[in-house]
């Protein structure tokens, strides 16, 4: 019974709406909708402008890759500084004169029989006898049977390190306490000697005495001894009574090879002389720079 009543009421409302003139409400409704649309557009515009101003106020920063939770990135220049792009300052080496001046005469029972003092320490050689055994030693070598180490080689002495202090071992026959000889360039000295001998071969006896040695009529070598000027002899690392048996690998005991060796020596700027010393063979390098 309620349904017909509701249907009648709905039909009555629809009939009344049809009688209302829509033109009276269409224009006000249009302006209301336009006003709402303008309000929404204005709000959206202000939001966009506000967002742009916030982004422009912050300075640009590059993106820094890193794990979450890290603090501000810091540029580490330590690796660049360790590259030493401009080189490293060289530490001043201890002067040889100061070492020699502070080195007392050694009490080591050893004898310095020969030296080859070179401007290149790696080529310097000292011939030292200890406990009846003679050997050649370079800088940094320990003398056999001792805790003494060769530190420096000069023309008339050797500085050794023994019991954590420097000591002086003088060349046999040289007096301790004499001034340290000035360190000239051995190559320059040898070059001047070479020029002198080329001009006057007879001057060789000033530096070196050479005498052939024969046993049962057979050539066994050439005996070498210092001349009136023994400095060069000692600098070459030769020892009195050394016997030369070859030059640059050519056997001086063979006549043909000996002649070939002499021809090489005439124009050579360097050579290796093999000498026999107390039953052992030693190579002596001789540089005759032009």
UniProtKB/Swiss-Prot annotation:
It comes from Aeromonas salmonicida. It is found in: Cell inner membrane. The chain crosses the membrane at residues 29-46. Its main location: membrane. This is Type II secretion system protein C. Keywords: Cell inner membrane, Cell membrane, Membrane, Protein transport, Transmembrane, Transmembrane helix, Transport. Residues 1-28 are cytoplasmic. Residues 47-290 are periplasmic. Pfam families: T2SSC. Belongs to the GSP C family. Involved in a type II secretion system (T2SS, formerly general secretion pathway, GSP) for the export of proteins. One of its GO terms (biological process) is protein secretion by the type II secretion system. InterPro entries: PDZ_sf, T2SS_GspC_N, T2SS_protein-GspC. GO terms for cellular component: plasma membrane; type II protein secretion system complex. The lineage of its organism: Bacteria, Pseudomonadati, Pseudomonadota, Gammaproteobacteria, Aeromonadales. PROSITE patterns: T2SP_C.
């Amino acid at each position: 019974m309620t349904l017909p009543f509701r249907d009648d009421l709905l039909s009555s409302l629809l009939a009344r709406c049809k009688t209302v003139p829509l033109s009276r409400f269409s224009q006000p409704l249009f302006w209301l909708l336009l006003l709402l649309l303008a309000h929404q557009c204005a709000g959206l515009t202000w939001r966009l402008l506000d967002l742009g101003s916030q982004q422009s106020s912050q300075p640009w920063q590059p993106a820094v890759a890193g794990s979450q939770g890290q603090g501000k990135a810091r540029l580490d220049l330590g690796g660049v500084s360790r590259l030493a792009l401009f080189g490293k300052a060289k530490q001043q080496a201890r002067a040889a004169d100061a070492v020699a001046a502070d080195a007392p005469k050694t009490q080591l029972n050893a004898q310095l029989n020969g030296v080859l003092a070179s401007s290149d320490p790696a080529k310097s050689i000292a011939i030292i006898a200890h406990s009846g055994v003679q050997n050649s030693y370079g800088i940094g070598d320990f003398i056999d049977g001792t805790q003494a180490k060769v530190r420096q080689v000069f023309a008339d002495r050797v500085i050794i390190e023994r019991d954590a202090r420097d000591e002086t071992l003088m060349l046999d026959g040289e007096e301790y306490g004499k001034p340290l000889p000035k360190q000239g360039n051995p190559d320059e000295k040898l070059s001047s000697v070479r020029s002198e001998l080329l001009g006057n071969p007879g001057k060789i006896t000033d530096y070196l005495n050479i005498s052939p040695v024969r046993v049962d009529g057979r050539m066994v070598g050439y005996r070498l001894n210092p001349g009136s000027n023994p400095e060069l002899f000692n600098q070459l690392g030769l020892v009195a009574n050394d016997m030369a048996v070859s030059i640059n690998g050519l056997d001086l005991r063979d006549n043909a090879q000996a002649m070939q060796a002499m021809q090489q020596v005439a124009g050579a700027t360097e050579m290796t002389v093999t000498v026999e010393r107390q039953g052992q063979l030693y190579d002596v390098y001789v540089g005759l720079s032009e």
